[in-house]
């Protein structure tokens, strides 16, 4: 009897040890930065999708993670240098893949928000009028067609950069820019009458772009990045990510954003 109890106790300890080994190494504290961007995170309310996601990531990992607020441009610089462990809702490109790894948890499309009085009905209308200025957030990248538009207009000095959404909305209202690139997280601000009444949306003919937990390759080993990716995948599999998105979007839109293939 004693031998059976001892065997069961050792098995339990073994299971606990394996579970701890499978999770992230919490022997040090980590850093994670949010950025102020619509429904992803609002500094005014200290709430948003990425805030909820970060809270759940901290709870599940059991690690100490210091959360701060930064501009997107600073986030990418610190991720590259290893001065920041994590950020959220990031998208990949060839340059970023050199220094960052990603754990995907949603995807969304991008749209061109333009002034009605500019007479823009398709992308070519914007691209071919030298008087039109495009507003973007510094260090943001978008879908393929949107990126091509930004790069082409940047080369012609037709892009105005800002640190966040609010300055771009103001520039659009004041006719300093004729368009800006948006995503579903920006919808509440666009629904405000002063913006809705003067704008319309032009679609990019692009598929949805995956967004994920950003992990610094310099700060985190490949093995540890896989452990954090496994946590994110668990949050997707058990419906946690979906429940977070349904707090902020109608179910059909939430479904379209969280249902995607993890592999290209």
PLM features: residue spans?
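Short helices/loops that flank or line small-molecule/ion binding pockets
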Residues: 68-69, 73-85, 125-127, 165-186, ...
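Acidic, polar ligand-binding/catalytic clefts
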Residues: 55, 64-128, 139-142, 201-206
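Extended ligand-binding regions for polar small-molecule ligands
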Residues: 51-60, 124-133, 140, 214-252
């Amino acid at each position: 009897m004693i031998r059976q109890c001892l065997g069961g106790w050792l098995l339990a300890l073994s299971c606990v040890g394996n579970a701890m080994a499978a999770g992230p190494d919490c022997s040090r504290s980590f850093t994670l930065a949010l950025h102020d961007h619509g429904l992803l995170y609002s500094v005014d309310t200290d709430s948003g999708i990425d805030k909820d996601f970060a809270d759940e990531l901290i709870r599940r990992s059991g690690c100490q993670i210091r959360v701060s607020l930064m501009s997107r441009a600073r986030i990418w610089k610190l991720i590259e240098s290893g001065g920041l462990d994590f950020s959220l809702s990031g998208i990949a490109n060839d340059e970023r893949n050199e220094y960052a790894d990603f754990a995907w948890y949603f995807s969304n499309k991008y749209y061109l928000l333009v002034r009605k009085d500019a007479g823009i009905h398709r992308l070519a209308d914007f691209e071919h009028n030298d008087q039109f200025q495009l507003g973007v957030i510094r260090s943001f990248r978008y879908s393929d067609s949107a990126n091509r538009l930004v790069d082409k207009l940047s080369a012609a000095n037709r892009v105005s950069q800002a640190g966040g959404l609010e300055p771009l909305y103001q520039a659009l209202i004041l006719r300093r820019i004729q368009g800006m690139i948006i995503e579903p997280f920006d919808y509440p601000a666009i629904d405000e009458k002063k913006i809705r009444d003067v704008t319309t949306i032009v679609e990019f003919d692009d598929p949805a772009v995956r967004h994920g937990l950003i992990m610094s390759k310099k700060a985190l080993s490949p093995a540890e990045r896989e452990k954090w990716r496994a946590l994110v995948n668990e949050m997707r599999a058990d419906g946690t990510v979906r429940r977070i998105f349904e707090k902020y979007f109608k179910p059909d839109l939430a479904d379209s954003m969280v249902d995607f293939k993890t592999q290209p």
